Amino acid sequence: MTKGILGKKVGMTQIFTEAGELIPVTVVEAAPNVVLQVKTVETDGYNAVQVGFDDLRDVLSNKPAKGHVAKANTAPKRFIREFKNIEGLEVGAEITVDTFEAGDVVDVTGTSKGKGFQGVIKRHGQSRGPMAHGSRYHRRPGSMGPVAPNRVFKNKRLAGRMGGNRVTIQNLEIVQVVPEKNVILIKGNVPGAKKSLITIKSAVKAGK
């Protein structure tokens, strides 16, 4: 069965196994998610569960938002996302971190850190030119075909805005779950800055 939960990235730390092996982990705080809506093939054309995370202040929510969460008997939520192919949940039910177990393989989605306007070396990993001996080519993007094509091709790697993209890292392992603190420890790094929204769901390629 597919599992899914929303949380916030706290940061990174490290833990040790009983054998003394060091494991770098990312700490994700996932307070209980509330099921706001259950979508079915008959009514919506597909099966999905809509969940909400992080209570929103009453002043910041409008009447439609309050009406939407009224059936779940909960406060309006800051983040609302859908998980497909999750069964056995009803409106108002809570999804907690103990849904997952140590050893589960998951896909983690977040928004990468924004870096602003960057050049081709930082943005695309291109090599620079010689820095001396009369060279006038240092950190520029290189030839763009000004003569033969007489135009710049689409998808040419150029300088521009870097980061701030939706990124998914697949097949990460859950090292530990701490239900009393609503915390999940995931092996390795996950995309996003501290306090950013993180989506954790069962890996689609697990075992492949």
UniProtKB/Swiss-Prot annotation:
Domain of life, source organism: Bacteria
Keywords of the record: Ribonucleoprotein, Ribosomal protein, RNA-binding, rRNA-binding
Function, in words: One of the primary rRNA binding proteins, it binds directly near the 3'-end of the 23S rRNA, where it nucleates assembly of the 50S subunit.
MF terms in GO: rRNA binding; structural constituent of ribosome
A GO BP entry: translation
Oligomeric and partner information: Part of the 50S ribosomal subunit. Forms a cluster with proteins L14 and L19.
NCBIfam families xref list: L3_bact (TIGR03625)
Keyword Cytoplasm: no
HAMAP family cross-referenced by the UniProt entry: Ribosomal_uL3_B
Intrachain S-S bonds: none
Ribonucleoprotein listed as a keyword: yes
Family listed: Belongs to the universal ribosomal protein uL3 family.
Stretches the record annotates as Disordered: 123-147
InterPro entries with a match to the protein in the record: Ribosomal_uL3, Ribosomal_uL3_bac/org-type, Ribosomal_uL3_CS, Transl_B-barrel_sf
Any single GO CC term annotated in Swiss-Prot or TrEMBL for this entry: cytosolic large ribosomal subunit
Name recorded for this polypeptide: Large ribosomal subunit protein uL3
